[in-house]
Amino acid sequence: MEGKPMRRCTNIRPGETGMDVTSRCTLGDPNKLPEGVPQPARMPYISDKHPRQTLEVINLLRKHRELCDVVLVVGAKKIYAHRVILSACSPYFRAMFTGELAESRQTEVVIRDIDERAMELLIDFAYTSQITVEEGNVQTLLPAACLLQLAEIQEACCEFLKRQLDPSNCLGIRAFADTHSCRELLRIADKFTQHNFQEVMESEEFMLLPANQLIDIISSDELNVRSEEQVFNAVMAWVKYSTQERRPQLPQVLQHVRLPLLSPKFLVGTVGSDPLIKSDEECRDLVDEAKNYLLLPQERPLMQGPRTRPRKPIRCGEVLFAVGGWCSGDAISSVERYDPQTNEWRMVASMSKRRCGVGVSVLDDLLYAVGGHDGSSYLNSVERYDPKTNQWSSDVAPTSTCRTSVGVAVLGGFLYAVGGQDGVSCLNIVERYDPKENKWTRVASMSTRRLGVAVAVLGGFLYAVGGSDGTSPLNTVERYNPQENRWHTIAPMGTRRKHLGCAVYQDMIYAVGGRDDTTELSSAERYNPRTNQWSPVVAMTSRRSGVGLAVVNGQLMAVRGFDGTTYLKTIEVFDPDANTWRLYGGMNYRRLGGGVGVIKMTHCESHIW
């Protein structure tokens, strides 16, 4: 009753009144227990299972057509559903069912301009959070997702199409992205087209381009061509594919070919003598403009314009990839790359599996990740990364045995996997991969079992440096002769090292960091094959076990590692003239026990992804 304190009843222990159960009523704050009564403990609880289980039950209700309050009519298909689920997932349906539209009161709603199967897949996603995008459905799924404003599915479709990019289909994907306002996909397809123009211009899609799209492409300063002759030849091939229809469009298109950049011989002998060019006044004017530019160098400052601007040169450089490893107590699948030209670390596509202790090397400009440990299991699977498409593929044959802490290198067109451990024992097994046959073959085993071994190739030989035999770190080194299929012992290092970094620099093998019996190491040494001797090199600034070592654009770089306390995301660059290591930061992840590889890429390639 308003204005009066509430009564509260509390249980009295048996024996207080001679009754088993009774009540004692008090007046006061209903949220406060009487003195002497302990306050209850609190235990907040959040269920991880609840959302999934709830969705599963609601989906069962849908399948049994129970509690459904709307039927979507798509073509000849009727799809039973719940308005609240559709509204929660799709702004399109939320506007439809919560506004004043007629559909908000209808039990059957007709949805037009959408594929039946695509709608089924999207409704399934609303109830299950799962969908499979594939080549057979992406072209109907993306427009449907756009209509229903399902941003997540739009992104998934665009990501799928990015992975399918090829010189034969990039123009179609570009047009598809433009139609459906997928800006990121359009940007990627544009970059891909520009970089691969020499192959794209030979495709059927190129010949079918409308004039406005052709102009968009050839107008780009980023077009990857050896000379402007290729652009002219591409335009003339396009015109002659359908001469009668396209001849009137030639002057408009030719304006975007940079004729002043052609050689005089090609301009006069090929362009000026072409019958289609000669027969059109506007085309002849463009040729005359180019001739004047070439013949009157003193007038060139007054003649500058889009047609005289050189296309940006395609620069080549090496890019460093850091793959997998151990971070924050777990194996990781992430991959990042370092471009020395921009001094930037950027994330790229992750591997399909988490891998620490992974062996990494580059064969035919493709990055291979071999074996490793995913945090619970030892792996024999292999993945391959293509930097041109930013994709990992798992269609590489597995090694014959599971391996982590394995050394991997390329010699004579083969990928070698050396040593490691399989979860039972330390290995001396060596096998090599033939990319043409997609097959691994055993070769001669090392004389010593080695995990955490570093490998390098120099002078046609494969070197296995240090590691551990399963009991203690090693300073021994073996060299494999592929002609003899034999391993030979050579001079040992000055320091025992496992999980070290190794690379060939200035015709010598450098071994850095790692761990000995007691601690992580910052020391470094190098091997001279001419004298069969190891000699000390100035130590790095940081101790680094699980360090990666690579040569990038002529610079020796030590990447990541563990200093005994902290996982590192720094790199050090060796300066042989000053005999010092210079420390740099910038990696996205602190990493231990991953792999590194170096791929030569054009400037354009390195900026597509």
Curated annotation (Swiss-Prot):
It comes from the Eukaryota. GO terms for cellular component: axon; Cul3-RING ubiquitin ligase complex; cytoplasm; cytosol; dendrite; perinuclear region of cytoplasm; PML body; trans-Golgi network. Kelch repeats lie at residues 319-365, 367-413, 414-460, 462-507, 509-554, 556-601. Residues 170-272 form the BACK domain. GO terms for biological process: Golgi to endosome transport; negative regulation of apoptotic process; proteasome-mediated ubiquitin-dependent protein catabolic process; protein K33-linked ubiquitination; protein transport; protein ubiquitination. Pathway: Protein modification; protein ubiquitination. Residues 68-135 form the BTB domain. Its main location: cytoplasm. GO terms for molecular function: actin binding; type II interferon binding. It is found in: Cytoplasm, Perinuclear region; Nucleus; Golgi apparatus, trans-Golgi network; Cell projection, Axon. Substrate-specific adapter of a BCR (BTB-CUL3-RBX1) E3 ubiquitin-protein ligase complex involved in interferon response and anterograde Golgi to endosome transport. The BCR(KLHL20) E3 ubiquitin ligase complex mediates the ubiquitination of DAPK1, leading to its degradation by the proteasome, thereby acting as a negative regulator of apoptosis. The BCR(KLHL20) E3 ubiquitin ligase complex also specifically mediates 'Lys-33'-linked ubiquitination. Component of the BCR(KLHL20) E3 ubiquitin ligase complex, at least composed of CUL3, KLHL20 and RBX1. Interacts with PDZ-RhoGEF/ARHGEF11, DAPK1, PML and CORO7. Interacts with F-actin. Interacts with IFN-gamma (IFNG). Interacts (via kelch repeats) with IVNS1ABP (via kelch repeats); this interaction blocks the assembly of CUL3-KLHL20 complex. This is Kelch-like protein 20. It comes from Pongo abelii. The lineage of its organism: Eukaryota, Metazoa, Chordata, Craniata, Vertebrata.
